[in-house]
């Protein structure tokens, strides 16, 4: 007799994760771990120190509230899974570092959580790796962060070409529509964020934006920069050129895109994102000089966040090969359990990874089979007898 469909559906829902979340199995987890470690090493090499904001934040009434996953805690307080690490860092800095002057260099590798419509199929958990330079101002700070942005992607193995990184300027973009009412300007910018330049300009025209201003905005947004504020365009180009000085002679990268408008609303100056033809947007960042002031004393700041899963997809689209692991020795116990334990300890002390018995999920890791002879020697599958130190040299070669 078959299992009723309703019972099958209930059973399936019990073993599947909630909508928008997924299980990461060992092979992928290892690959993601390699990417995370590479990024963390790049952050540290530029003086950034890791920190860990809490998983929960106070639910807010900001424009991104609709994307927060909220619930009431046992105290009756409305809290949310953190939707954005930059905002969490801004709150932390305003509170914990309010009396500290000077520049802070902070980094993180952690997930954020954002609500997605049920029918969209979007992920509600996003693993991010990023940095925040708090207190750094001016062209040099912008260039350093933009250069680190590119360096992080390249250090993971991504081929960064001219079109991979796009650079814009929020001050220029909002200035193009400064004559509009704030609510209308928000509608126009919303259309631009969706990539609908024609729709944004049409809404500006309907709102009475003068024809000359419309022509100027059209030229700026469609790549004809000769009729826009030269100082703003020069700021974008100067930042890109200065960032490229980190690797003199390297291939050119960085395309000015005056229509670039990130999803998050707090950016105030230079903005940038990395786009891959197969994975879409894999990283973004920019200057946000007003965000920390929403929690306390204002401080200039700039940073970026990399979507680690999207970067992973982009790397595999380019036939990325993660570095090989050292093999795992599967040690078959002898009748003497004490000798087995001592042998395993000697092998580990020599630098060999050892598991007693078998391992069902190996995540692509190479294995060596061996039988225990005594507390320091094993017999390999080919019949050779090896002592722990000698085997360690062989495995490590």
Regions of interest found by a model, annotated:
Residues 28, 34-45, 57-58, 88-98, ...:
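Positively charged, Gly/Ser-enriched RNA/tRNA-binding surfaces
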Residues 69-76, 180-203, 278:
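Acidic, His- and aromatic-enriched active-site or binding-groove loops in soluble protein domains
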């Amino acid at each position: 007799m078959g299992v009723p469909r309703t019972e099958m559906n209930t059973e399936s829902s019990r073993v599947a994760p909630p909508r928008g979340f997924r299980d990461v199995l060992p092979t992928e987890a290892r690959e993601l771990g390699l990417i995370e470690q590479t990024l963390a090493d790049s952050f540290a090499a530029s003086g950034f120190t890791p920190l860990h904001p809490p998983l929960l934040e106070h639910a807010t009434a900001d424009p991104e509230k609709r994307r927060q996953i909220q619930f009431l805690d046992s105290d009756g307080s409305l809290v949310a899974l953190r939707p954005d690490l930059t905002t969490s860092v801004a709150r932390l800095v305003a509170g914990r570092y309010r009396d500290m002057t000077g520049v802070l260099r902070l980094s993180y590798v952690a997930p954020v959580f954002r609500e997605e419509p049920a029918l969209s199929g979007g992920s509600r958990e996003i693993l991010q790796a990023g940095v925040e330079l708090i207190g750094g101002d001016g062209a040099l700070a912008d260039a350093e962060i933009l250069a680190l942005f590119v360096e992080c992607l390249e250090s993971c193995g991504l081929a960064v070409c001219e079109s991979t990184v796009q650079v814009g300027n929020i001050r220029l973009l909002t200035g193009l529509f400064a004559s509009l009412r704030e609510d209308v300007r928000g509608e126009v910018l919303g259309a631009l964020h969706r990539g609908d330049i024609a729709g944004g300009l049409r809404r500006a025209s309907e709102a009475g934006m003068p024809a000359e201003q419309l022509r100027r905005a059209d030229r700026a947004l469609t790549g004809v920069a000769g009729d826009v504020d030269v100082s703003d365009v020069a700021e974008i180009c100067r930042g890109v050129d200065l960032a490229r000085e980190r690797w003199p002679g390297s291939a050119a990268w960085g395309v000015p895109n005056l229509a670039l408008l990130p999803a998050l609303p707090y950016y105030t100056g230079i903005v940038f994102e990395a786009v891959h033809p197969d994975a879409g947007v894999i990283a973004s960042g920019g200057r946000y000089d007003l965000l920390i002031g929403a929690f306390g004393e204002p401080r200039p700041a700039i940073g970026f966040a990399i979507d680690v899963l999207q970067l992973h997809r982009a790397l595999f689209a380019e036939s990325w090969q993660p570095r090989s692991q050292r093999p795992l020795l599967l040690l078959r116990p002898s009748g003497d359990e004490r000798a087995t334990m001592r042998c395993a300890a000697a092998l580990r002390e020599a630098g060999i990874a050892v598991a007693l018995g078998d391992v069902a999920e190996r995540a692509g890791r190479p294995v060596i089979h061996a039988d225990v002879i005594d507390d320091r020697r094993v017999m390999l599958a080919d019949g050779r007898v090896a002592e722990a130190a000698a085997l360690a040299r062989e495995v490590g070669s």
